[in-house]
C-alpha cells in the first residue's frame, strides 16, 4: 500500500486507471461513458483564460515594503507610516507583446504593485517610465491598436506606430525614453518603477497633497543594444523570467528605493505645466524626491498561473490616506482596469486567493458567476441589503476624503491647446551624452524601417522642434541605415499617397 495520495476525479472519486481509455474491445472505439477521459479533455480545453489586452507577457514575485521615512504629516495611510512592513506582490510586463512574446524586446515595462495592507489592498499600477504616450484616455484604445497586429497582415506595423506618434506630439517624451537605452532593459531587476500618474495624500486634518511615486532600482541600470537583444532572443525568449526567478531562488533579492514627490494642493494652480498631465514630469528642483522606504522582492510564486496570471491590479484599489487626482488617464483607468478583470477573470476576481485582501472584507455584493465565497459578506444572511436592522456592515466616516474643489464648464477641451510638448523632451535629450544620442538616433532609424516618407518627415519635424540636433541625427541615421533621402523617397510617397 502506497503512502502517496490517491488520484481522483474532480468530484473526488478514485481513478483506477489513468493510462488507458475505456473501449469496446481491445481495438474497439472509445465509449462515451468514459467520464474520466471526458473530464480530462474538457478541462484541458478550458485551461487558458483570455490574456490581458495589454501587458500580457509578465513576470512576478512577492516581497515586502518597509517604510523608513516619516511622511505622516502628509498621509494617514497606515501602510506608509514609519516602521510599517507590508507584504506585497509585484508583476512586471511588456506592453505590446502577447503571452509568447520574447522578453528582450524594446518596449515599456509595466511595474504593477499590490500591497496587502491592514486597511485593504493598495494597488499602484505603473511603468518603468514616469510618463506615457497619450494624455487623454479617449486615445488610449487607438494607441494600443497601433502596438498590436495589423488586422490584414497580422504583423506588427511600424507605419501604424509612427503615423500615430507623428500625429500625437504629446507622445514625444515617452517616445524619446522608449528609443533611448532605457527602452530595452536587460531584465526588470535593473529598472526604475514609477506610479506615473499624479495621486493624492490626505491626512487626519483634512489636508490634501498631490504626490508622485518613484521606485529607484538599487541594482543599477543595465540595457541591451538592439544587436545584443537579437542575440539574446536567439538563445532564449524567456531571459527576464530566467533572470528574476534565478536571482530570487539564489537569495539575490532585488531592492528598490521608494521615493515620493509631494506638491501642496494649491500649487497645482501655479505650475507652468499641468501637474495632472501623464505626459509630463514634475521637475525635481521644484519638488525634490523624498526617500520613504525600500521595496524588496524575496519569494517566487509557487504556481505562475494562479499567482501571476490570475493577479488583478487596479488603480481603483486605494486605502484611507491615499486618493486620486484630476489626471484624466488615471480617471479612466480607475474604471477600465477593474472592468478588464471582470471580463478576464470573472465577476468575483477579488476572491481569487492572490487578489484577496489580508484584512476582513464585508460588503453586500451577491450572487454572480463563480461566487465561491459562500454568499454575501455581511456575517448575517438576513442582512443582504443596506440599511438593515440585522447588524450588517456599516460605513466608516473616517475613511472619507476631504472635498475636492473643481470648476469649469463641461466640454470636450482640446488638450493640445496651450500645451508645450517639446520642452520636457528637450530637457531629457540634453541630458544624454554623445554616445547615448547616437544610440537614440540609431534605434529610431531601425524602428522606422519601411515607414512611408511623409510620415517620417512629419516625425522629423517634431524632433526638430525638440532640438535641431535631434532631427539631424535621426535623419543621418536613416540615410546610413536605409539610404533614406527626403528629396526622393518622401516626395514619391507623398505623390503616391495623394493619388
From Swiss-Prot:
EC number(s) from the headed UniProt entry: 1.11.1.6
First-level EC class: oxidoreductase
Region (Disordered): 1-25
Cofactor section: heme
Protein residues bound to heme: 337
Positions annotated as active site in the UniProt record: 55, 127
Coiled-coil stretches noted in the UniProt entry, renumbered to this chain: none
One GO cellular component term: periplasmic space
UniProt keyword annotation of Nuclease present: no
Catalytic activity: 2 H2O2 = O2 + 2 H2O
Gene3D superfamilies listed in its UniProt record: Catalase core domain (2.40.180.10)
GO molecular function: catalase activity; heme binding; metal ion binding
InterPro entries per record: Catalase, Catalase_3, Catalase_clade1/3, Catalase_core, Catalase_haem_BS, Catalase_immune_responsive, Catalase_sf
Chief place of localization: periplasm
Function: Decomposes hydrogen peroxide into water and oxygen; serves to protect cells from the toxic effects of hydrogen peroxide.
Subunit structure: Homotetramer.
Protein name: Catalase
Provenance organism: Brucella abortus biovar 1 (strain 9-941)
Lineage: Bacteria, Pseudomonadati, Pseudomonadota, Alphaproteobacteria, Hyphomicrobiales
